Amino acid sequence: GGKTVTVAKAMAVAQPQAALVHYAAEHKKMATIGTEQSLVIDPGSRTFDWLVTRGMRLVQKQSHSINRGMSDVLRLLAAEISKDVGSPYRDYDAIDLALRSGKSPVIFQKPYDMGRHLPLAESVAQQAVSTMRQWIETPESLQNIILVGGGAFLFKKAVKAAFPKHRIHEVKEPMFANVRGFQLAGQNYAASAIAPGRDRGAGEIA
């Protein structure tokens, strides 16, 4: 008894590329982003992704993804806490909240000082960013370095250290940068499909 929807055309957009669309819209760079070279860095839950673009075109040989996401950080810290308290500890949500808020999680009814484990968390970010840096051939040519994703807050320090002469751009609510970019790209694509005589490319921004 439901509705039937026919999809006439589909558009594939890489996840960090959608974040670039969102960044351009939020920072009012829609008119200029198409001529600029950008690096989009997306530390997510399970993977650490990065994308180099010229305009909106992907530079495949400089873009990649590795298994170094926030889940790796949380599991590593949980293992250290478990050894410290002498009991298995797997409250990943509590660890995540503590990292984001700076407030101590409560373990066995007592606030637990996470400070001693922060260098360990930062080392995961440093390893991921160091790997990415080896893929970037001409960092001096990057006009935009954009940090998005749920792990942006933890990886920011390592990213800044890797690109000390660049300004690192951020967006509001970086966790939702990709999904908002997907929506905007879809809306632009739909509008171009409706407009007579237009057939906008998948990566082009209106």
Kindly label every feature range from the protein language model:
Residues 42:
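Conserved catalytic-loop position in the HRD/HxD motif
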